[in-house]
Amino acid sequence: MGEPVTGTAAGVPFTVLPPSAEVSGPAPVVVAWHMIDAPRSDAAFAAALPLAGVPAWRVYLGMPLCGARMVDGGMDAVVERARRDAMLAYVDPFVRQAALEFPAALAELRERFGFDTSRTAVVGGSLGGAVALTILATREIPVRAAALINPAVRARSVVGLVEGMLDRPYPWNDEAEQAADQLDFVARSGEISARETQVPLMLVSGEDDHPSLRTDADDLVAALRERYARPDDVQLARVAGLAHPLAEEPGIEPAPQLPIAKLVDDTVAEWLVRHLG
């Protein structure tokens, strides 16, 4: 496997892994967004979920204020935003910015690496899963396959987790409610299923993930299976022993892949190989 390539594209930090096997012609591309939990940078996510079994370019994009965009080399700025306003200073702007940055970053990376964007897959973990779901729901970028790991399916559930950590209720208002509605992908399942070609989707959910996120995962899979012409194109893999993170703390720098992450990696890779073509 070639060495990781790092840099920025359209202002977005990236880690790119070249195809690990010879491919004839331009190879497909898998674009992945990391967690805010560990692994919490593009480089760390590439190490935790390298997807080496997929004959494609694997592009890991950095979330706002993470990795090369961290403030003062740490995550304090992210924590401050979550404390200040979990919905309007953290969840909504992070997901929205990452989704808005994607097309320009993808175009620049395609010019540099020459991958085939007509065969694109999206992958996301936790809050990065909400970015991937936003891409699917907005339907502007063609996507051939998708995989989500412990995704943030409903923003209200993420806010609920922050409420628990801060031990205080979130002060919901109309603006926050509207933002949360846009990041409720069970409610938006009709938009995801309305793509001209319905995207095969694998949702990996840890048995030890937060209960609210496990419930949301079940609800999204059920909603999409109801709407898909081929319900088997939507699958839920519930993984024993998997909590929310995919890596150990601090999760900023690349680290050896954990055995549980290898299990997730194999599950996602098998799905992408089957559907990316």
Q: What positions do the PLM features span?
A:
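Short, surface-exposed "cap/lid" segments of acyl-processing enzymes
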Residues: 10-73
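Conserved alpha/beta-hydrolase "nucleophile elbow" surrounding the catalytic nucleophile
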Residues: 34, 124-126, 206
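Acidic beta-to-alpha connecting loop that harbors the catalytic carboxylate
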Residues: 36, 207-210, 242-243
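Short, flexible, mixed-charge acidic loops at enzyme active sites
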Residues: 69-84, 161-165
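Alpha/beta-hydrolase active-site loop
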Residues: 79-113
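Primarily recognizes the serine-hydrolase "nucleophile elbow" in alpha/beta-hydrolase
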Residues: 104-166
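The feature captures the conserved acid-bearing segment of alpha/beta-hydrolase catalytic domains
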Residues: 156-229
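C-terminal catalytic histidine-bearing segment of alpha/beta-hydrolase fold enzymes
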Residues: 227-277
